[in-house]
Amino acid sequence: MARTTSQLYDAVPIQSSVVLCSCPSPSMVRSQTEPGSSPGIPSGVSRQGSTMDGTTAEARPSTNPLQQHPAQLPPQPRKKRPEDFKFGKILGEGSFSTVVLARELATSREYAIKILEKRHIIKENKVPYVTRERDVMSRLDHPFFVKLYFTFQDDEKLYFGLSYAKNGELLKYIRKIGSFDETCTRFYTAEIVSALEYLHGKGIIHRDLKPENILLNEDMHIQITDFGTAKVLSPESKQARANSFVGTAQYVSPELLTEKSACKSSDLWALGCIIYQLVAGLPPFRAGNEYLIFQKIIKLEYHFPEKFFPKARDLVEKLLVLDATKRLGCEEMEGYGPLKAHPFFETITWENLHQQTPPKLTAYLPAMSEDDEDCYGNYDNLLSQFGFMQVSSSSSSHSLSTVETSLPQRSGSNIEQYIHDLDTNSFELDLQFSEDEKRLLLEKQAGGNPWHQFVENNLILKMGPVDKRKGLFARRRQLLLTEGPHLYYVDPVNKVLKGEIPWSQELRPEAKNFKTFFVHTPNRTYYLMDPSGNAHKWCRKIQEVWRQQYQSNPDAAVQ
């Protein structure tokens, strides 16, 4: 018979050093349970357990007379309550929890408080995951892992006060800037290696290491999170593997697929995938569905794009090895010493990584052909430049000042001839048409332009082929700038709309050279290359439309 919520919680000695997944954007928790896992949260305590009020108790019986008379114990600090905090925005939501930013009223300190519904934990059979994360987090004390500061409860919920990783997921920055330069890749890889060395030294396998589970604190150092699927290897047991299927498809190790087991070396495989993604912008194993991804993993089917850093490539090749006992860093390969001595880390000082200043995040955009040039972009500089994009009478002179400001003029007055002369694959319209002329243009576009089907009946103002880059990979796309405004991009071979660059007041074009131009948005920078060498024309036209939208229409700027 199922226990009531109060009975469940009475059986759970919640410790002040215990935490569930603290990721601001928790990944989906799996439904599999470990063989031998208790169906409920055990009522016993760990090696240094806690009573319900958070006091520490020894697991062994005590003959101390003071402990036999609870009334003689010194008073304990008052447990925190929900009313001690001002709760703010939601940082993330998981399958059975919500993480909320909260400020403690007495100290003004900020925490990421994870809130769990007791009843839902029982109903959805999530007790094993609560137990697992409790056991793992109670063993960790390292700057590269999330920290639990306190726990408390009310009648319906459990609350866990966690360190607030202010800068969010590492994945967010990979998506924003595409690929990291070598200095950034080296530093963050070193921090992950240092964290794994500590974790594996504690006999713990993470089993779901990926950029989503690596957070960045206020100082841009990593904090690894999400231990719901971790495994603690018993020191009394010779078993060095965990026998259950957990993880995320792109980072799953081959032994998990073929033997249904994971080991410490499985985390090293995930490390190899992460290094590859930091440099290339995408994980090494990609396909249309999980089955195809798994097939590529067990066949070791991946390739390095051109301009991949040679030393980083060598390191990845020594980590993405099908035989788990042959991966650099595993116990069979003499542990972490040889891994940390790899030439990729030759400039790293390992002793005090958490006290070092992380390098500024810088995008790496190597030239795609011999007549191009490498481009680098500083993420911090980009964010500071967004401040100059505000539309007001006092700041309009700063808006998009990096590109030309004059509007192109249409030559001649014969609109029919103008329409007739338009190329069906690449052209640019000016913005000086009357409403009747725009109507004629739209009619012509609807009747004869093969790209009209993708633009939601908006008039195309400029279009042409570009190479759209994501990390070190580039794909040919048809870029369509329309009224609205919109920036659509289409697969020209399969004739499929692939996406849209989001317009906002903060959007900013930037020409890097004749071919390469960026479109900066708050959440991502789009890297584009015009094969005709007219990047400046794209920037000029995007600027025109931006100005018409936000300077000619002040109401749009405040929406």
UniProtKB/Swiss-Prot annotation:
One of its GO terms (molecular function) is phospholipase activator activity. It is found in: Cytoplasm; Nucleus; Cell membrane; Cell junction, Focal adhesion. Highly expressed in heart, brain, liver and testis, also expressed in embryonic cells. One of its GO terms (cellular component) is nucleus. SMART domains: S_TKc. It comes from the Eukaryota. The modification Phosphothreonine is found at residues 357, 516. Its main location: cytoplasm. Disruption phenotype: Mice show severe pancreatic hypoplasia at birth and ensuing hyperglycemia at postnatal stages and die of heart failure by 11 weeks of age. Residues 35-44 have a biased composition (Low complexity). It is a peripheral membrane protein. Its EC number is 2.7.11.1. Residues 116-160 are annotated as: PIF-pocket. Coiled coil: none annotated. The active site is at residue 208. Residues 25-83 are annotated as: Disordered. Homodimerization regulates its activity by maintaining the kinase in an autoinhibitory conformation. NPRL2 down-regulates its activity by interfering with tyrosine phosphorylation at the Tyr-9, Tyr-376 and Tyr-379 residues. The 14-3-3 protein YWHAQ acts as a negative regulator by association with the residues surrounding the Ser-244 residue. STRAP positively regulates its activity by enhancing its autophosphorylation and by stimulating its dissociation from YWHAQ. SMAD2, SMAD3, SMAD4 and SMAD7 also positively regulate its activity by stimulating its dissociation from YWHAQ. The PH domain plays a pivotal role in the localization and nuclear import of PDPK1 and is also essential for its homodimerization. Homodimer in its autoinhibited state. Active as monomer. Interacts with NPRL2, PAK1, PTK2B, GRB14, STRAP and IKKB. The Tyr-9 phosphorylated form interacts with SRC, RASA1 and CRK (via their SH2 domains). Interacts with SGK3 in a phosphorylation-dependent manner. The tyrosine-phosphorylated form interacts with PTPN6. The Ser-244 phosphorylated form interacts with YWHAH and YWHAQ. Binds INSR in response to insulin. Interacts (via PH domain) with SMAD3, SMAD4 and SMAD7. This is 3-phosphoinositide-dependent protein kinase 1. It comes from Mus musculus (Mouse).
